């Protein structure tokens, strides 16, 4: 009985041992299979990530090289490997817009905007797309959202760049007053930067605000008196505004900063004209004798111009000349006063100057633009640089 019991116990132990070994083997096999599966899965995932990066890189390069259609194909492929990658979605939306698929790009960016309404880049792209779609108000709204949105990197610089872009857009659609407001805000937020100040001045000039533009050019020249672009631009604006003396100074200094062969012909002509106008202008700054000499010279030029123009219109219109009124002024005794008489009566000097300027303006309207010194007198008369 004892022998049988021992054999039964031994058989049970062998059975338990065999089952344990089998179970342990199954566990080991399962562990190995799990490890292999995890390895394959991770390898597959890594491979997909690598492929996604490779295709997105191709898309980025295609965008940089100006091939948006190629970029679209590459980026769609990248998204097939990494469907939730936000950076790839942004690039694809950008590529769609660059390729001219405006509606598709707009809708894509709108979907991204729903997730990140404060993203500066997304709002900027939506602003540009809205502008292309001629949705003016939406474009302006998105530009403002981009300005006040979040940016990676130097947000201050990016916001300023967006505000300048908005100003350019406003100028392009004829909304100059709003453009001026944006530019002045950009200027107020700008720590002194020459390139930015010059850009602001150029844009203000384009917007039709020459005084504001000139203030920025002067601001640059206060810090950098020999800044060539500012000297030339300010000189042109002073010339166009009729301040020929200041124009001559600025243009002369600007030209001095340039190599002789680099000076534009228009600048040289403007400089020469400004010098000539300053030399012939009946300014109060010169001596009384010199002023009267200039008045007499200008009167001779204006009278010759009147006589030529009057003969031309009289031949065409007969006795009813449109210059009849100015002609009666020339026929008056005080229109031929000599040097001594003018020196004794400052009022007559000013009256003669007014006759000269009125003659140049009226003859230009009736007989066309004059040439030579008369053309310079016309510029002088329009600017009213003569001082009381």
Report residues per predicted region.
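TPR alpha-solenoid repeat register
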Residues: 88, 122, 156, 162, ...
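Eukaryotic alpha-helical solenoid repeat scaffolds
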Residues: 232, 236-240, 244-388
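Conserved structural position within tetratricopeptide repeats
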Residues: 77-80, 110-114, 145-148, 184-188, ...
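Register position in tetratricopeptide repeats
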Residues: 64, 98, 132, 168, ...
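Alpha-helical segment of the N-proximal tetratricopeptide repeat
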Residues: 48-84, 91-98, 165-172
């Amino acid at each position: 009985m004892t022998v049988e019991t021992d054999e039964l116990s031994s058989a049970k132990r062998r059975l338990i041992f065999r089952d344990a070994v089998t179970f342990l083997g199954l566990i080991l096999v399962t562990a190995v299979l799990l490890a292999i599966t995890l390895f394959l899965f991770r390898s597959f995932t890594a491979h997909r990530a690598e492929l996604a990066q490779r295709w997105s890189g191709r898309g980025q390069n295609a965008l940089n090289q100006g091939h948006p259609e190629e970029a679209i194909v590459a980026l769609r492929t990248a998204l097939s490997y990494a469907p939730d990658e936000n950076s790839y979605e942004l690039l694809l939306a950008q590529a769609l817009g660059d390729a001219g698929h405006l509606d598709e790009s707009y809708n894509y960016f709108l979907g991204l905007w729903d997730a990140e309404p404060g993203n500066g880049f997304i709002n900027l792209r939506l602003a540009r797309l809205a502008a292309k779609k001629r949705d003016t108000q939406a474009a302006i709204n998105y530009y403002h959202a981009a300005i006040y949105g979040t940016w990676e990197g130097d947000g201050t610089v990016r916001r300023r760049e967006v505000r300048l872009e908005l100003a350019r857009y406003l100028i392009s659609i004829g909304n100059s007053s709003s453009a001026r407001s944006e530019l002045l805000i950009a200027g107020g937020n700008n720590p002194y930067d020459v390139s930015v100040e010059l850009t602001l001045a150029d844009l203000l000039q384009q917007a039709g605000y020459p005084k504001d533009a000139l203030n920025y050019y002067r601001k640059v020249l206060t810090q950098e008196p020999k800044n060539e672009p500012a000297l030339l631009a300010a000189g042109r604006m002073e010339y166009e505004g009729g301040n020929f003396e200041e124009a001559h100074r600025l243009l002369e200094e600007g030209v001095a900063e340039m190599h002789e062969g680099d000076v534009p012909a228009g600048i040289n002509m403007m400089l020469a004209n400004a010098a000539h106008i300053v030399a012939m202008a009946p300014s109060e700054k010169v001596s009384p004798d010199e002023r009267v000499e200039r008045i007499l010279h200008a009167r001779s030029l204006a009278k010759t111009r009147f006589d030529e123009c009057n003969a031309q219109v009289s031949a065409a219109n007969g006795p009813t000349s449109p210059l009849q009124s100015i002609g009666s002024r020339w026929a008056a005794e005080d229109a031929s006063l000599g040097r001594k008489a003018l020196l004794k009566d400052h009022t007559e000097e000013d009256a003669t100057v007014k006759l000269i300027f009125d003659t140049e303006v009226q003859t230009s309207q009736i007989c066309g633009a004059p040439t030579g010194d008369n053309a310079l007198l016309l510029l002088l008369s329009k600017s009213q640089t003569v001082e009381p």
